[in-house]
Amino acid sequence: MSNNNFKQEDLELLRKIGKKAEASQRDLANDLNLSLGKLNYCMKSLMRKGFVKINRLKENPSKIKYILTQEGIALRTKLTIDFMKKKMAEYDELKRELETKENK
């Protein structure tokens, strides 16, 4: 599973779905500061790739619940780990730069 095609907004969307499965696309778009059109595009892509599925709520069939599939959970985990590794590498680089400047 290559994550070269995934962006930070995909990780944020996967995390939000994991926390707020019953949120509407409008709620998710507002939470992530994305346009509704962009959120819809990202959501369709994640569903097409099998990372997210939808279920209609029994008590209100017009409402949708977004669910992470096992693949979606695995992707969220991998993207989170990759994000943390990137941030730790950035931190280490900044720390080296500061130490170099202090030693001059």
Predicted features and spans:
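Short, cationic-aromatic polyanion-contact patches
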Residues: 3-10, 24, 55-78
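Alpha-helical residues within the helix-turn-helix
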Residues: 30, 47-48
